[in-house]
């Protein structure tokens, strides 16, 4: 994946969880090097809410895709 994510993006596990639980998420990105318990919880939540999950190599690269200078374990694309 190159460039930046487009659309309305929320960054971080708390925001991702909140958007999925409120059925506002259309797509969730999870970094493959994120804490496995955290990643498993997010993936399971997405399955329960029928939200597609895509994996990104590293937290750093996911952060870059989101336009921030730090890594992030998860990011979510939300309905506008």
Task: Locate predicted features.
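Alpha-helical transmembrane segments of helical membrane proteins, especially in multi-pass transport
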Residues: 29-30
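Feature captures the catalytic cores and cofactor-binding loops of soluble hydro-lyases/lyases
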Residues: 34-60
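General secondary-structure edge motif
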Residues: 25-26, 42
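Alpha-helical elements of the RecA-like P-loop NTPase motor core of helicases
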Residues: 18, 40, 64
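C-terminal structural segments of small proteins and small subunits
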Residues: 51-80
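Ribosome large-subunit tunnel/peptidyl-transferase-proximal elements
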Residues: 1-24, 35-37
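Signal for well-folded cores of large energy- and translation-related assemblies
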Residues: 21-24, 47, 67
